[in-house]
């Protein structure tokens, strides 16, 4: 029986994969072909395509089989037949496992001191993780299981981030220890940990929520006493090897040259993916961050810059028309900097952080998305001065109103 918990998007397990030659994967986007221990790096062509189509495995995609598949895996001539067999086996396993998964998860919950625990709604069913709402006499909880193939460092980093940001400071879901004092348990091929269930609502892309998100981000960046580094790479060096065969490479390298060395600038506790999609509002109105997978000590400017192109550029995938959400960007900055405002030097660094963060994702959605992502990058950069003028005009208006 196939162990799907160790399988990556291409239908193989990276560790010990027979397709690798001298440790290199033929399906890698990067020229050297080196694949890290965990394949979810965005450099694998198949994984990048799956990420673009929001599916865990290629054979679960609604477009399977597609004409691009043989091009992405030319070394596997029977790929469609093989993937069809995997899809059938996967579905059969899901049907058989779902019949007893509740009782198995309830046995997992026995590790925690809960009275009358029960398994409720499952979230993100096709994510590769097991995420369930848990009911108990003491309230609601969230049980999260990461595949055992996930590196231990990722699990430990996630746990430490929740303990710091959640348990100590209330800016994320708190983590609950087991009866024996452990932070997570190994069972069913997963590492499980139990978290606080946030009663409230998901943040939305509104000026009001962006303002609240900016305030919460400021609080997070000011926290002291954490020393676990974020796994997010701060260096821009690797990007100089990207897109060598694209017509825009000269302009791309010029953009890279202008980006500062963020590892030499402000370091603090960072989330790495700040946006309404990763934040909630408690019933009392307080903002909390969720999905702390890459959280830790990192660049404040990369963290702060993330949404200014990645989120605030609204891209229509059908028409390729773009618009900039100035209202959201202004509200987020106002929430973060408050009445003191933002200096021009600080603003430049934030926007350079936005540029680098967008570049870091330009290989994550496959080679066919690169040109669109390049257009988004240039469009986002072109809005920089217009947003600055908007901020300055609002500051003048506020100053006039306070006299």
Report each predicted region and the residues it spans:
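Cysteine-centered metal-binding/redox modules
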Residues: 1-94
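ATP/Mg2+ or Mg2+-diphosphate-binding catalytic cores
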Residues: 94, 360-403
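A conserved alpha-helical element in kinase catalytic cores
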Residues: 145-189, 204-216
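Conserved kinase catalytic-core helix
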Residues: 200-232
């Amino acid at each position: 029986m196939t162990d799907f918990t160790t399988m990556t998007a291409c239908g193989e397990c990276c560790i010990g994969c027979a397709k690798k030659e001298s440790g290199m994967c033929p399906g890698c986007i990067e020229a050297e072909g080196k694949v890290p221990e965990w394949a979810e790096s965005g450099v694998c062509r198949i994984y990048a395509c799956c990420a673009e189509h929001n599916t865990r495995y290629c054979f679960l995609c609604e477009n399977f089989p597609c004409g691009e598949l043989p091009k992405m895996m030319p070394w596997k001539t029977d790929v469609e037949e093989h993937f069809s067999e995997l899809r059938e086996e996967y579905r059969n396993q899901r049907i058989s496992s779902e019949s007893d998964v509740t009782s198995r998860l309830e046995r997992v919950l026995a590790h925690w001191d809960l009275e009358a625990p029960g398994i409720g709604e499952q979230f993100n069913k096709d994510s590769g993780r097991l995420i369930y709402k848990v009911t108990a006499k003491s309230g609601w909880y969230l049980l999260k299981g990461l595949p055992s193939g996930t590196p231990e460092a990722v699990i430990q980093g996630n746990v430490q981030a929740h303990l710091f940001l959640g348990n100590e400071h209330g800016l994320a879901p708190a983590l609950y220890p087991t009866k024996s004092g452990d932070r997570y348990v190994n069972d069913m091929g997963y590492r499980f940990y139990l978290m606080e269930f946030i009663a409230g609502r998901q943040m939305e892309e509104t000026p009001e929520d962006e303002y609240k998100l900016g305030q919460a981000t400021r609080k997070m960046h000011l926290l002291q006493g954490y020393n676990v580094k974020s796994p997010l790479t701060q260096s821009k060096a690797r990007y100089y090897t990207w897109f060598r065969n694209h017509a825009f490479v000269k302009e791309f390298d010029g953009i890279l040259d202008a980006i500062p060395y963020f590892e030499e600038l402000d370091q603090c506790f960072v989330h790495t993916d700040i946006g309404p999609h990763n934040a909630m509002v408690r019933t009392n109105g307080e903002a909390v961050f969720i999905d702390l997978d890459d959280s830790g000590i990192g660049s404040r400017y990369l963290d702060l810059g993330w949404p200014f192109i990645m989120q605030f550029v609204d891209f229509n995938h059908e028409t390729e028309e773009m618009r900039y959400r100035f209202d959201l960007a202004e509200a987020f900055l106002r929430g973060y900097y408050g009445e003191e405002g933002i200096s021009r030097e600080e603003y430049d660094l934030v926007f350079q952080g936005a540029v680098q963060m967008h570049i870091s994702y330009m290989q994550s959605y496959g080679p066919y998305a690169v040109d669109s992502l390049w257009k988004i990058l240039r469009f986002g950069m072109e809005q920089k001065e217009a947003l600055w003028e908007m901020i300055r005009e609002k500051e003048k208006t506020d100053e006039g109103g306070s006299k």
